[in-house]
Structures are given as structure tokens and as C-alpha cells.
């Protein structure tokens, strides 16, 4: 989040050096490798590929996309030493990581590479929705929604649509004493439209008592997707409050 990094640098007087890694990799794969003499940083980027990792940005058909265009973040196989070589009791799951894009490890993240080679991670591919052929980051929308007065927590998900493929829907948990559900929803829709354009405009904002979360605080977005798409779902064993889905 560039705004958070800017705030931290301004208030601490120290540089914030970002990086990106996964448990499966055992080591940062995108970083600013100061020890190699390259101190370049770019706002909003995790950095450059660490030596030993070769990244590519591919579309859903496995074709490379142009610099600046978002796509699936993958790493050429074989992975560097220290990366995972199996998944415990889940050989099929391990193999699936390399099957979607033959010759590459599928990170499950979406992002893009800019003209200078810096890699920008937009979020999980599950959090990227395809609206009328355009890939939109729900994370960007959530930042705007969360910044609205009266919003305590939020989640933006993609609802199925017969014409556009998907449309963005927001679930909002309001703060005590906010200015009414309809006013809050209207302000939120307007704010997202103003900052991201009509294509990313929220189709609907649902103000709900609570959002479904795990006991560790992670919002169960997949559960919200199933609810809004009228799909059958099971209550996850990790959910914090089993009454929340019924209330939504």
C-alpha cells in the first residue's frame, strides 16, 4: 500500500524497503537487494526479481502480457534451492501448482511488471475480477471503501453477471453512529466511481452487521462470493461467529 509506506517514511524518517515471498519459496523472491549494490526502490513495487528467480506475467491462456498489463505472476521452474518440493499429504495439490502454466510455478498472485523491470503485486488472483474483459483489483476498491467515514470493515467481491461476466459488490460493516445505511452506500459507490472510473463502479453496497471472519481475523471472501451468487455453502470450521452468514 503506497500511502501507508509514504506515511511510515514521513513519520519515522526511515526508508521502507518492501519485498515479496511465499512460504513455499522459503526466501524472498522479489526484493531490493542492497547487498548487491542496487538500492533502487519504486513506490508500490515489491522490488526486482531476486537472483535465482525468473518471473513472468502471463494471461489466463499462458501467453506473456505486455509490460504494465496485469496478469498471473509465475516463476519459471525449477525453483531455486530451498523452495518446497512437496506438500504434506497433498501430492496432487503440489503438482497442480506446476500444471496450470507448464514450465512455471503458479504463485496464485496477480500483478504486473513495469518498463523498468519492477514487479508490482496486486493481490491474489481470486481477488482479481474480470469485468467486461477488464481485470480489476478488488484490493484497490477495498482501500477506497475502507477510507469512507462510517466504514469499520469491508470486502469487495465479484458477483456473476450474464452480460459483463462479473460485477463488483461491496459488503460493509458500519461504525456506530454512522449516517444511515443508504447514505453510506451511496457515498461509497460515488467514491469508487470517482477514483477508479465507471468500469469499476460498485453495482451494490450491502451494509451488514458483521463480516464473516476466521478466528484469526481473515475475512471469508469465498463465503461471501457463494452467498451473493446464491451458491450452496458450508460453514467453515475456522469461522469466528457461525451466526454471521445467516444474518447476511
Features from the language model and the residues they span:
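Short proline/glycine- and acidic-rich turn/helix-capping motifs at secondary-structure junctions
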Residues: 205-215
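Conserved ATP/PPi-binding loop(s) of AMP-dependent carboxylate-activating enzymes
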Residues: 48-52, 63-97, 136, 231-233
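AMP-binding/adenylate-forming catalytic core of the ANL superfamily
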Residues: 55, 75, 80, 103, ...
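Gly/Ser/Thr-rich phosphate-binding loop
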Residues: 1-41, 54, 61-63, 88
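Short, P/G- and charge-enriched loop/turn segments at secondary-structure junctions
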Residues: 38-45, 96-99
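Active-site glycine-centered loops adjacent to acidic/histidine catalytic or metal-binding residues
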Residues: 21, 47, 109, 133
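Hydrophobic alpha-helical segments, especially N-terminal targeting/anchoring helices
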Residues: 58-59, 107, 113, 213
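Short, charged, surface-exposed hinge/linker loops at domain edges
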Residues: 232-248
Amino acid at each position: 500500500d503506497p500511502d501507508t509506506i509514504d506515511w511510515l517514511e514521513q513519520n519515522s524518517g526511515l526508508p521502507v524497503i518492501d519485498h515479496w515471498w511465499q512460504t513455499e519459496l522459503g526466501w524472498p523472491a522479489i526484493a531490493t537487494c542492497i547487498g548487491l549494490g542496487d538500492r533502487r526502490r519504486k513506490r508500490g513495487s515489491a522490488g526486482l526479481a531476486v537472483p535465482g528467480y525468473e518471473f513472468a506475467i502471463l494471461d489466463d491462456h499462458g501467453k506473456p502480457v505486455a509490460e504494465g498489463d496485469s496478469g498471473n505472476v509465475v516463476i519459471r521452474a525449477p525453483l531455486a534451492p530451498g523452495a518446497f518440493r512437496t506438500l504434506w499429504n497433498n501430492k496432487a495439490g503440489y503438482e497442480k501448482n506446476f500444471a496450470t502454466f507448464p514450465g512455471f510455478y503458479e504463485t496464485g498472485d496477480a500483478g504486473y511488471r513495469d518498463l523498468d523491470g519492477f514487479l508490482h503485486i496486486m493481490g491474489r488472483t481470486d481477488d482479481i475480477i474480470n469485468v467486461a474483459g477488464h481485470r480489476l483489483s478488488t484490493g484497490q476498491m477495498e482501500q477506497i471503501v475502507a477510507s469512507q467515514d462510517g466504514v469499520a470493515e469491508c470486502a469487495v467481491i465479484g458477483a456473476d453477471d450474464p452480460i459483463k461476466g462479473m460485477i463488483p459488490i461491496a459488503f460493509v460493516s458500519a461504525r456506530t453512529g454512522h449516517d444511515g445505511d443508504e447514505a453510506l452506500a451511496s457515498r461509497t459507490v460515488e467514491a469508487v466511481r470517482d477514483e477508479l472510473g465507471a468500469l469499476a463502479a460498485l453495482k451494490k453496497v450491502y451494509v451488514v452487521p458483521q463480516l464473516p471472519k476466521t478466528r484469526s481475523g481473515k475475512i471469508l471472501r469465498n463465503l461471501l462470493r457463494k452467498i451473493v451468487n446464491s451458491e450452496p455453502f458450508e460453514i467453515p470450521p475456522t469461522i469466528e461467529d457461525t451466526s454471521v452468514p445467516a444474518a447476511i
